[in-house]
């Protein structure tokens, strides 16, 4: 088992929490961050809204049926990026091995941290305390020997908590881990696993590598390693971007048409970055990762600069 010390920091209901900080009179009410419209989907939901079954990627129409009293606020991506920059400034006090996953989550390798703190759990506590002191927002953290385990652990004490998974407890932890907690296991894959008698990562571990390959394709190789607590991926430090991008990870498998409901949000976020950096774009690429980790990309390149109004349309044409 790796001797690395990896922290996965995940802000709690980030977009919704930022909006509640800006509009404290809404605290205690179910708040949804989304554009209103028949085809819109939720960007984020406060914990009060989640009690009614609301979650990101849910259609606004469905959300209004489940929780008619919810308060809807439009997203403010410029503000979210500003707050995210504050959070990353906190990270840099402890390590330069920071791998952002989105505005509200990142991996940190604190095996050798700037403050020489021996216990990664203590590093996570300090980081979470500093984030709260400087932004008024709470974060959850998972601490483990690798990225796979740290990401799972960060969800274990949400919200505003942390979970430490030391190397000697990994196998026992995985033995009872529900399959749905494994990244990449969506509804379709989970149903297939259950048909094979699998319920936990421990059940999955009893299958040979070749068997998993037969059942799940190339993803079977990845599963074989993950359920044994193996993930050698390094934390990739931030590098200067050669392109401007934005992305979203959906919490569950969705039909293509419903997933496409996120394109207006992504297009607006992308255009804000383009205008802020004072650059021009002539090509647009759409990347889609499927439940079994296949990546599909489509790129369109034009002879003229893309105007604001055309960006979302170009994304749909991809």
Swiss-Prot record:
Known catalytic reactions: DNA(n) + a 2'-deoxyribonucleoside 5'-triphosphate = DNA(n+1) + diphosphate
Cofactor note as given: Binds 2 magnesium ions per subunit.
Biological role: Poorly processive, error-prone DNA polymerase involved in untargeted mutagenesis. Copies undamaged DNA at stalled replication forks, which arise in vivo from mismatched or misaligned primer ends. These misaligned primers can be extended by PolIV. Exhibits no 3'-5' exonuclease (proofreading) activity. May be involved in translesional synthesis, in conjunction with the beta clamp from PolIII.
Subcellular location: Cytoplasm
Origin: domain of life: Bacteria
Keyword Zinc included in the entry's annotation: no
Swiss-Prot/TrEMBL keywords: Cytoplasm, DNA damage, DNA repair, DNA replication, DNA-binding, DNA-directed DNA polymerase, Magnesium, Metal-binding, Mutator protein, Nucleotidyltransferase, Transferase
UniProt xrefs under NCBIfam families: PRK02406.1 (NF002677)
Stored InterPro entries: DNA/RNA_pol_sf, DNA_pol_Y-fam_lit_finger_sf, DNA_pol_Y-fam_little_finger, DNA_polymerase-Y, DNApol_IV, IMS_HHH_1, Rev_trsase/Diguanyl_cyclase, UmuC
Substrate discrimination (site feature) positions: 15
Protein family according to the UniProt entry: Belongs to the DNA polymerase type-Y family.
Single GO cellular component term: cytoplasm
Active site, per annotation: 105
Segments forming domain UmuC: 6-186
Gene Ontology BP terms: DNA-templated DNA replication; error-prone translesion synthesis; SOS response
Protein name: DNA polymerase IV
Binding site for Mg(2+): 10, 104
Lineage, broadest ranks: Bacteria, Pseudomonadati, Pseudomonadota, Betaproteobacteria, Neisseriales
EC top class named in words: transferase
PROSITE patterns reported for this sequence: UMUC
HAMAP family: DNApol_IV (MF_01113)
EC number of the protein: 2.7.7.7
UniProt gene name: dinB
Subunit and partners: Monomer.
């Amino acid at each position: 088992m790796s001797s690395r010390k990896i922290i996965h920091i995940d802000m709690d209901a980030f977009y919704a929490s930022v909006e509640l900080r800006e509009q404290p009179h809404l605290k205690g009410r179910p708040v949804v961050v989304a554009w209103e419209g028949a085809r819109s989907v939720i960007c984020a939901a406060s914990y009060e809204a989640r009690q009614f079954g609301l979650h990101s990627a849910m259609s606004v129409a469905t959300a209004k049926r489940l929780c008619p009293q919810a308060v809807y606020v439009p997203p403010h991506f410029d503000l979210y990026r500003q707050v995210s920059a504050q959070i990353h400034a906190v990270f840099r006090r402890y390590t330069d091995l920071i791998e952002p996953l989105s505005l509200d989550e990142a991996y940190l390798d604190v095996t050798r941290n700037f403050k020489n703190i021996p216990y990664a759990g203590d590093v996570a506590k300090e980081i979470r305390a500093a984030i709260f002191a400087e932004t008024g927002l709470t974060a959850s953290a998972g601490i483990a020997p690798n990225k796979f385990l740290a990401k799972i652990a960060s969800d274990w004490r949400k919200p505003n908590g942390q979970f430490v998974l030391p190397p000697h407890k990994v196998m026992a932890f995985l033995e009872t881990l529900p399959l749905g907690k494994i990244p990449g296991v969506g509804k379709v894959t989970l149903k297939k696993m259950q048909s094979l008698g699998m319920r936990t990562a421990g059940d999955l571990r009893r299958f040979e590598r070749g068997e998993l390959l037969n059942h799940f394709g190339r993803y079977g190789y990845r599963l074989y390693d993950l359920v044994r607590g193996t993930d050698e991926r390094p934390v990739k430090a931030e590098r200067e971007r050669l392109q401007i991008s934005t992305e979203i990870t959906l919490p569950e498998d969705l039909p293509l048409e419903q997933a496409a409901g996120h394109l207006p949000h992504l297009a607006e976020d992308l255009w804000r970055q383009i205008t802020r950096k004072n650059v021009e774009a002539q090509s647009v690429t759409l990347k889609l990762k499927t439940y079994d980790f296949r990546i599909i990309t489509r790129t369109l390149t034009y002879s003229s600069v893309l105007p604001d109004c055309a960006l979302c349309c170009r994304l749909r044409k991809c």
